[in-house]
UniProtKB/Swiss-Prot annotation:
Pfam families on file: Pyr_redox_2, Pyr_redox_dim
Role played: Conversion of NADPH, generated by peripheral catabolic pathways, to NADH, which can enter the respiratory chain for energy generation.
Keywords: Cytoplasm, FAD, Flavoprotein, NAD, NADP, Oxidoreductase
Annotated catalysed reactions: NAD(+) + NADPH = NADH + NADP(+)
Gene Ontology process terms (BP): 2-oxoglutarate metabolic process; NADP metabolic process
Cofactor: FAD
Entry's family note: Belongs to the class-I pyridine nucleotide-disulfide oxidoreductase family.
Binding positions (FAD): D35, D36, R37, P38, Q39, V40, G41, G42, N43, C44
Self-association and partners: Homooctamer. Forms a polymeric filamentous structure in purified form.
Protein name: Soluble pyridine nucleotide transhydrogenase
One GO CC term on file: cytosol
Organismal lineage: Bacteria, Pseudomonadati, Pseudomonadota, Gammaproteobacteria, Pseudomonadales
Subcellular location: Cytoplasm
Keyword set includes Cytoplasm: yes
Naturally occurring in which organism (per UniProt): Azotobacter vinelandii
């Protein structure tokens, strides 16, 4: 059995693992990474963020073509199968794997492909697909194994028409009707994707509002646009059982309703990938959702073992995971790169997309903060009119006395890009965080960024 010695070993090569490995090696540490796939990238690259966003982009292009009057001069609306649009995602995945493999090679980071489990707090065994076992010894470890869809025991995921958010990427046909159980971020994103392909979607939500962590106005806008695209949203519903048939699936709800569709997508919760790590050998225990508890330095209860990304829970975003991994390595190397990651913008890739940072109106009202609102509707923006993307708005929440920006919420074309301008100003200290920045700054024209100036004027006009 081969034995290798390192300063830092990172388990997982998703965003958190990559961030940790790169920061540790830049600090002069000898680093290795382990992944249970035969390629780097983690769930983010192979099953999550990258394929779903590539799918969304392809579907959005189809929708633009079908909805643009200019193209009606060429021919009738065109429809593509799910398998067709998935091909573009596969190409993006291959490019991402190639790029990330190069990152590890250029930085002289050793890569091991196999299942890692702890023998003790300084040793792991890596079991490769061919059965070969290697031992890695390290001073510190970073657990960045990510998460997977939660699967309740009473749902038969071996049935060929029942999927979760990982296996849906193996769907070989386009269903006429699809049931999505779970209206969180992933459920709403896939509802947008499939409805854009002409699929009738039933979106089952066990709450009374979609994505209730969002600003209420943004959540309402999402509900409207999903319904406008033939998504039937059913709130306050819970499943009783899922019945798989030869030609479809019947969802039995506790309310007594029955819904039949060609396929069923379970999208209700995720669990951390900790069950194969041998945590019991080092005195660690994951919670009921498979997540590992860490302190503000991303250190677990075992002093030389850290964790980052989805495996520690909130916020379960690729962007935050990378920074968490980088910060965990910063804690290990003490190279001043540590920070607790809590100022995280939300990006939701529905159609139209959503992004936000800071406080919502509900939160500010509950805290009795004297705020005001400035809005810019995209239908009045020249760039949105040119792009035929008139749905959406930018909303700025600011303190009515100091003009400090308290929250930015965006729904529509390029929302996930637009939000970062507001985030940058919000992160300025003291009087530099002010609504007046957008009044006193010249924006390119026509741009979507110009919405900040329009929203700022709108907000100032509400003051007296």
């Amino acid at each position: 059995m081969a034995v290798y010695n390192y300063d830092v070993v990172v388990i997982g090569t998703g965003p958190a693992g990559e961030g940790a490995a790169m920061n540790a090696v830049k600090a002069g540490r000898k680093v290795a990474v382990v992944d249970d796939r035969p390629q780097v990238g983690g769930n983010c690259t192979h099953l999550g963020t990258i394929p779903s966003k590539a799918l969304r982009h392809s579907v959005r292009q189809i929708m633009q073509y079908n909805n643009n009057p200019l193209f009606r001069q060429i021919g009738e609306p065109r429809w593509f199968s799910f398998a067709d649009v998935l091909k573009s995602a596969e190409q993006v995945i291959a490019k991402q794997v190639s790029s990330r493999t190069g990152y590890y090679a250029r930085n002289r980071i050793d890569t091991f492909f196999g299942t890692a489990s702890f023998c003790d707090e300084h040793t792991i065994e890596v079991v490769h697909l061919n059965g070969m076992v290697e031992t890695l010894v390290a001073k510190q470890f970073v657990i960045a194994t990510g998460s997977r869809p939660y699967r309740p025991a009473d749902v038969d995921f071996t049935h060929p028409r029942i999927y979760d958010s990982d296996t849906i990427l193996s769907l070989g046909h386009t269903p006429r009707r699809l049931i999505i159980y779970g209206a969180g971020v992933i459920g709403c994103e896939y509802a947008s994707i499939f409805s854009g392909l002409g699929v009738l979607v039933d979106l089952i939500d066990n709450r009374d509002q979609l994505l209730s962590f969002l600003d209420d106005e943004i959540s309402d806008s999402l509900s409207y646009h999903l319904r406008n695209n033939n998504v039937l949203i059913r709130h306050n519903e819970e499943y009783e059982r899922v019945e798989g048939l030869d030609n479809g699936v019947i969802l039995h709800l506790k309310s007594g309703k029955k819904i039949k569709a060609d396929a069923f997508l379970w999208s209700n919760g995720r669990t951390g990938n900790t069950d194969k790590l041998g945590l019991e050998n080092i005195g660690l225990k994951a919670n009921g959702r498979g997540q590992i508890q860490v302190d503000e330095h991303y250190r677990t209860e075992v002093s030389n073992i850290y964790a980052a990304g989805d495996v520690i829970g909130w916020p379960s975003l690729a962007s935050a995971a990378y920074d968490q991994g980088r910060s965990a390595a910063g804690s290990i190397t003490e190279n001043d790169s540590w920070r607790f990651v809590d100022d995280v913008p939300t990006g939701i890739y529905t159609i139209p997309e959503i992004s936000s940072v800071g406080k919502t109106e509900r939160e500010l009202t509950q805290a009795k903060v004297p705020y005001e609102v400035g809005k810019a509707f995209f239908k009045g923006m020249a760039r949105a009119q040119i792009a035929v993307e008139k749905a959406g708005m930018l909303k700025i929440l600011f303190h009515r006395e100091t003009l400090e920006i308290l929250g930015v919420h965006c729904f529509g074309y390029q929302a996930s890009e637009i939000v970062h301008i507001g985030q940058a100003i919000m992160n300025q200290k003291g009087e530099a965080n002010t609504l007046k920045y957008f009044i006193n700054t010249t924006f390119n024209y026509p741009t979507m960024a110009e919405a900040y100036r329009v929203a700022a004027y709108d907000g100032l006009n509400r003051l007296f």
